[in-house]
């Protein structure tokens, strides 16, 4: 009974169940109500007796006893005196644990501003007072007076006065007015503020003013005032008059041996505050001179600043060893802070770690656990079993037995472990497959055995990797481990839906070796009655694995109706394939293995098995496949010898001809036909091409061998060269690596990524000379340095992604939207990169799909497309489908199952409660790390593709030109003069087969709708320069060409040929150029132009010198030249349509690996504006050009209704539209990388989603990483959570305010229900960091980044956190509202009992201690009526 009573007395026990957490400002009364007494002295403990000093920082009277149930002087000991307060030492007799929760306080002799609300930008105190931070600081740190009450004087409230001004005012007005300095002055002003009147005034001001910047400034202040009004915070609480003292056990003082003490930095900081506070009290009692008191007050302010946030203002206070002391703010922020170190990641009991070794004999669901480790991990289970068996009477006896390791202990360990899964984890855990459950198998030794097939998921290898083992203790945990985390349940990768339990290396090699066919092998032509005979023939040596034989095969497959039927047929196959078919499960046809299986094939086999046979069969099959693969790769006896690296005979020839070509280009350069940049590009191209040629010849030679068949004729077959079969099977190595061994090492990159133009012509077999070796190490070092940096970058990207998407969970079945994204196949050049089937697999159709060419419906809306469906659609020739997407889902919180589609890791529709946000973040983040760790595998060899310079059609069909504008050259061909043009090739059904971008200046040999043949070259261009093409005949006139200033004449020393190169305006120096200007009356005047404002341009004039216009328009034919353009024409030269006036050299391409890729992905997700963004048309209409300003041209778009839209574009931007051309809203006007914010504004959400998905997929595709589009869409959805209010209507928002989408929609529904005007809004795109920081949950945001800023803002606004996301729930120590926790939270919400009826006085105590005022009672929360925690 006593225990029961005691529960009420313990302050931490009342609140287990709460629904929300609110953060706010603490009033002085509230701080006093938390406190158990005032700390008056800076002493800590007595150094002789080790007892805490009375009234000191560790005082037992205030904070509670040091030992359980024992007062300090020792008068009361034992449990029976519980609750007694000792009259001698004043200590309450209770548990010592209260020293972790009892707080004290310090009464400050002078008020002090809280540094967070002063210095955390924007300064809240400054904003409330409408003063600049600098001014507020001058008042607080006693450099200026502030007028509090002007009285009848001409001074204004809030005016600052220096010492001199103050003395003058006192002389003039006496004590008519009140002006003071320091925090008390600010406190007085804040106390006297009438927030409501101020807010009304601001609203009127906002309506009255028209200036954008003023509105922005006023609404910032208005928002803060309203936050104060709503939250019940009072402005004067920003200034502290009482300082709370942290419980002593949270800032411990630990005696070290040798009589010294280790202490928390906080004690030093508190001591400082107390010392200064006491000194100030004394000075005030003594009525010391003003200047001394002022100085002391300032020092008090500084010491409190240091305690709260050391180093935020001025120099940080340092301890003895020159290291800044850790203040309260440092305790919670950063990687080592409370949030990330202790709340989000904890150390786990019942765990161990050890090195891993390979366990090739294990089954897929097993792992080998060392006996000693298991004994230690399962101790409590063993103890209880020993006791239950009566083998040990007490726990102590059981412990002894276990330590002696008697025989019974091992038997019991076997029992305990049976069917008790353990979790294995390998750091870094980049995705959810980094922790999986296995059944332990006890083994001797000290290393953990791991099944080879799960290595891919863990990214583990056996070169010394370590793994951790964890034991799930509770029944629920064991159940979850078995049902969801077992390795056998994780066969498919959540990122792409492909199998991840896929054989690699030896296994692939063995299976490839089995399924290879050999000409004239022993036993060729045998006829065998069944697989048993095949076994016999192979084992007796009558036949070899690759021999072609005829076998009677008995297969069991599913027929069309889905029934299992048996078929027996005679098949021509090889011994190896028949043997392999023996382990294939029922339901897979013999065709599945009747081919040469490389890594892709084996992966496809596992996938097909999963789809046809299901999970269980696949698991068994995967194991069998592994055992078989290991067996036959051992049998194959593959080994590498130096002779296997066959250097092709025609390598010498290829090198010689390449050197010839290079010499020729050097000659051209010498004769001035090409520039230095072009020469470099061409040389690099030649070598890249040669390298491919040599590699091709080498693979040709290695991959074929000549053999004699049974008839005695010579035939060629695939070779059995060891290196070749390793690469060909996909077991290890790649063509690129073999090329370096036996071909030529090729071009290498410098550390800055540029390619060294002299390649390494030797290979590793021939060996490198010193120079070649140096060049090769040069690039390789960069690879290693990159790896270290990229790993960190990638980890940070993953962290940001998880943070932005962590609260996205599937919360309902169907949101009922018909919106979605239109999917089409992705075609790059002549290749279909991703078919429509691959893109829509596992998605839900948004609108009925019609059969092409008819009105019949092929698929109804709402169908989840599985493999069978997409195959059917492929056969029908459907080329676009609108599917549901997370981006367009209308669920308020979370996303619905229909919009998400298939759960990729399970292969069926997604379950409610699945944490799709985190899965998406992991799927995108994990390959980032993988790829970055993989940059150096090719050893810095520059993998640069030879530049494309022509379009060669692959399929016969019809050419179609899309937005290409051409002019006819006098030679008869067409020249493209538009930029975003594309040429597509259609097959006879009108389906698009190929798509090519046609650059400006390309020469086309076909027109629109012309027939083309496969292999025909339809367009070609110079890849290294960008021409400026004339569209009229005429004569060239140079304008603003000033040699030595705007253009440099470059004369080639060898040839004497000269060309003009336009200089960069930034590097022109200062000076002025005089130029003649003819005005309208024909009068010639002279004007002076600064060098940097000169704009070199080529005008075209007719024979009489009049300006020519571009055909069919009123635009003069003026061509501005950008910096770097090369002009080879002379003034007054004659040009014809389609001629090039100038060439702009293109940059040499740097090697693109994901290093270019990772920052690119980060830029896209952060929604950063590109350096030179493309300029998009703001409206649809006809283009015109208006009056130009000095550096800009004015582009005018006239809409169909006659409205015009103007835009100023810098003249140096290459405008791609011409006068009179029609543009659509959102079309590109000036080249560049599109700005995602523009795409969203002009083209809408779906186009934005398509753009981001496309760009990110391009980066990953380049690296051969498959990620499903839906993961990227999920992140995009999270980036679009916020909206900008464009018209507030009758809502309380301000124009331009950023509001959460779900919140705004809910408010609008309420407004419409009351027949009021809802707020109008536009979607807003936030980068992932910004989006994470602006989430509804302050706990989640604070634990992510910028903790101080987030908490400061949350506290002033008095925000409640409804604990919706996963992160908040982990931090407060609950199950997450996803997965199995989803049901728990739903049940909690329904039960939510009314607060227990305790006697009135106790309830009051509870709420008083919570600081909600006397018995206000709980404020009702959204979903339930549990009290809030403050």
UniProtKB/Swiss-Prot annotation:
GO cellular component: DNA-directed RNA polymerase complex
Entry-linked SUPFAM superfamilies: beta and beta-prime subunits of DNA dependent RNA-polymerase
InterPro entries membership: DNA-dir_RpoC_beta_prime (IPR045867), DNA-dir_RpoC_beta_prime_bact (IPR012754), RNA_pol_asu (IPR000722), RNA_pol_N (IPR006592), RNA_pol_Rpb1_1 (IPR007080), RNA_pol_Rpb1_3 (IPR007066), RNA_pol_Rpb1_3_sf (IPR042102), RNA_pol_Rpb1_4 (IPR007083)
Positions of Mg(2+) binding: 461, 463, 465
A molecular function GO annotation: DNA binding
Region (Disordered) residue spans: 1388-1430
Biased composition (Low complexity): 1392-1405
Residues at which Zn(2+) 1 binds: 71, 73, 86, 89
Positions with a binding annotation for Zn(2+) 2: 815, 889, 896, 899
Required cofactor names: Mg(2+); Zn(2+)
Catalytic activity: RNA(n) + a ribonucleoside 5'-triphosphate = RNA(n+1) + diphosphate
S-S bridge residues: none
UniProt EC number: 2.7.7.6
Keywords of this entry: DNA-directed RNA polymerase, Magnesium, Metal-binding, Nucleotidyltransferase, Transcription, Transferase, Zinc
One of the GO BP terms on file: DNA-templated transcription
Cofactor note: Binds 1 Mg(2+) ion per subunit. Binds 2 Zn(2+) ions per subunit.
Pfam families listed in its UniProt record: RNA_pol_Rpb1_1, RNA_pol_Rpb1_2, RNA_pol_Rpb1_3, RNA_pol_Rpb1_4, RNA_pol_Rpb1_5
Keyword Zinc-finger carried by entry: no
Family under the similarity heading: Belongs to the RNA polymerase beta' chain family.
Function: DNA-dependent RNA polymerase catalyzes the transcription of DNA into RNA using the four ribonucleoside triphosphates as substrates.
Subunit details: The RNAP catalytic core consists of 2 alpha, 1 beta, 1 beta' and 1 omega subunit. When a sigma factor is associated with the core the holoenzyme is formed, which can initiate transcription.
The name this protein goes by in its record: DNA-directed RNA polymerase subunit beta'
Lineage: Bacteria, Pseudomonadati, Pseudomonadota, Gammaproteobacteria, Chromatiales
Gene it is expressed from: rpoC
